[in-house]
Amino acid sequence: MPVLTQIFQVSTLYGAATLAAAIDAGQFGAARGSRRILLVSNNSAVPETALRLAEMPGYASIAARFDSVVDWNEAISPHHPSGWGPRAEETVLWQRAFRLAWGIGPEDRVELAVESIQVNPALALAAIFSESALHVYADGLMSYGPTRNKLPGSVGCRIRRVLHLDLVAGLQPLLLTEFGVEAELVPDDAFRRVLTEISDAAGGDPQLAAVAAEAPTAVLLGQYLATLNILTADEEEHLHVRMLRGAVRAGHTSLLFKPHPTAPARYSRALERAAEEAGVRLTVLDTPLLAETLYERCAPGLVVGCFSTAMFTAAAYYGIPIAKVGTRLVLDRITPYENSNRIPLTIVDHLVPDLEQPDALAEEHTDVRVAPATLGPLVRTVGYCMQSRLHPALRPEAEAWLRDRLDATTQHYFKRRRLQSLTLPGGGPRTTAVRLRRTVRRTRSTLGF
């Protein structure tokens, strides 16, 4: 008798926790009568040397929810998960091969739960299982922004929903709305229980025990923006020092720095020197733990970052005050304009207090858990400017917002050239010379000159 096989593709522990919470909440139906496969993908630049998901505390309990676990890297070896997709004429062969290898009957129905549907490996899976329904889960602030790339209609029409965390209550995701896909919240209590489960699994970690003993009152989050070519290594090093100094000014004397797993050791050394100069205690945690585990174990009074999703999990699920440092600089630097990090940066810049400003952590400014009325229109306007072709229906609202709200306090969310190319308010007149140059370029391109 044919059965339903659900394939859950994950690449991070945070994403796996999101799926586990959705499963626990019954959002994928009952386990009876279906088979669940956890498909693990390591998307690191060099997977062979990177930390494996199975090595992280808490992974085992999450994996126990599934009937079997498959390593995607091994399945497509020697190809890289981020760079490989099947040729159109080979998709049927790949599906037959994977059904055989993974014990899926030829008549069994398959559903896919994937992250980042715009890129591989999610796109590759969607192409191989071309008749399968798709469930997209988003585990961060990017879900509030537009889809990164235009998806084939054959993929978009199969997407049933976008599962996401309620990181900013009241703010609706733009992701995949061009296909009329509805967003569905993963319940807060289910996600928090999974985070507690992961934290409990890390209880025997000696580094975590040592960190908890230091009783840090502020956590500094590193993101390694230099590897994305947004900041230089020196600039990011200085950004971390600014975080530390801001926390010290706010009265914190015991601080914890959680660097990005791939960040160079020099970042930690620079912070250690700054902590020594400031006369405060700094602990560096370089063990592979979720930031949320630190919130569970250490109960800090402040979390500082640039635009990390972990800032908002601190606020939304633990009620910890958060503060930003360097967000405006990164917002100005990221290119192209449609870079999907722009929406997380916009949200953080609009909502989160700046640690380097006086009275940044005043009581009336610290609650970022609920979206103010000003945030939704701003996000939709930025989203339209990022992907105007995907969301033409947003143009009237974007025009109205720019006419009414664009000034010195909001100009940093937009680029003049982008507004000009879309003939939106704030872009200025498109001069005859500009139009002529573009016409000449198009003509030369058409004629092959």
Where is each model-derived feature located?
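Short loop/turn segments at strand-loop or loop-helix junctions that form parts
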Residues: 41, 70-75, 138-141, 216-226, ...
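Short, charged, surface-exposed secondary-structure boundary motifs
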Residues: 47-51, 144-150, 230, 292-294, ...
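Catalytic donor nucleotide-activated moiety binding site of glycosyltransferases and closely related
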Residues: 248-287
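A nucleotide-sugar donor-handling region in carbohydrate enzymes
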Residues: 137-228
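Leloir-type glycosyltransferase catalytic cores
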Residues: 334-442
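Active-site and donor-binding regions of nucleotide-sugar-utilizing enzymes
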Residues: 7-158
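Short acidic, S/G/P-rich loop/turn micro-motifs used as interaction or catalytic elements
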Residues: 13-16, 43-47, 117-121, 141-142, ...
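A donor-sugar binding/catalytic signature common to diverse glycosyltransferases
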Residues: 291-336
